[in-house]
Amino acid sequence: MNQSYILPNAWSLIEEGFDPSRVKSSESLFSIGNGAMGQRANFEEYYSGPTFQGSYMGGVYYPDKTRVGWWKNGYPEYFAKVLNAPSWIGIYIKVNGQDLDLYTAKEVHSFRRELQMQTGLLLRSFEVTLANGTRLSIESSRFLSLAQDTIGAIEYKVTLLEGAADIEVKSFLDSGVKNEDSNWDDAFWQTTAVNAKENTAFIEAQTNKTNFKTVTYQATEVYLNTAKRVLPTQTMEGELAVGHLYKASLKSGDTLTTYKYGGYILDRKVTGTLEAAVFEVVGRATSAGFEALKTAHANAWKAIWDRADIVIEGDVKAQQGIRFNIFQLNQTYTGKDATLNIGPKGFTGEKYGGSTYWDTEAYCIPFYMATKDQKVARNLLQYRYNQLDKAIENAAKLGFSNGAALYPMVTMNGEECHNEWEITFEEIHRNGAIAFAIFN
């Protein structure tokens, strides 16, 4: 790895010590995904310092109208933006009236963040002294299930290190999100419904222009010292957010553990209503519980590594780097869905846009051919075949006829959507890359 603060380790990315100047970088490096959804490694708790919030759904995009000083023949009408989706990870902690916020805390000790590539787990732990003097120990574990790709899970533990304290836990969803990367500062999302029932909450939203109908959901369980269930004292509903508030009194050594299950469901993937789909998924998640879901997820990663691992002896940084590449490829694209492809930044952020570049055929397909069942590479080629008519339309815009096809430089649905005209039409090798992949 070329980030000097990342500790060399054969199977993990490890960061030790809290430095606010590294937060955004680490949010990218420690990102997680399961092909259907992904997220930057944002903190679950409130953070008032510089951060780049990002959660994403595979294949969901917005056609952001092109912004140029002059128009040229064949110039794409829009750039397909990867959408920052409603966030489901929020677990805000308040102790004796003081927010848990690493940016304003009096002291932060023993901060450690680890991305376990072998098991697909994102772990974080630290001790903190809040501005009001309260001392806490925090441990969090998070993953997006490879075994059930509509389910993500968080285990978040707060231990009081001394004294006594009243604690509040706010578990919530937030659809008041925006893309930092926007040509015209358009609203990409429209929230259509906000609801909460018992320990479950959900927000229905759809994208403007492309009309992807989605639901973001959560189910929360809170326990005091693993045994006593803490029930929500209040349901919080707003136009763009919904959640539950939990309260407890702690003495020194007590631990409050929050289990949170969340994720996204697209209407095109279900036959009934989105609300019915939420309660079906929540039922599966809560019935299984965090540990069983984690085990199934780790087993799915084990099956991947059994076929895809590359061992480099004598250079731990090189070993770490190649496994990071393998990890990112597999959490970006699993091969289950022929409507998805391999975005250039995976689920690390919204910049660069687009879902599909020629890199898929030139560089990625050989990897999947060597490490996956053949249907995975076949699905990537099926994706291009399904967009052949759009490639013919694209060629026609440039004066070609008789069935000539020019595949786009960048696309989400088969239409060209790269905003740089010169790059779009100089990089004509993309047809050759696709032909090369078919040959292979």
Stretch-by-stretch model annotation:
Residues N2-R323:
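Beta-sandwich/jelly-roll carbohydrate-recognition scaffolds of carbohydrate-active enzymes
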Residues Q39, L293-N440:
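Substrate-binding groove/exosite segments of carbohydrate-active enzymes
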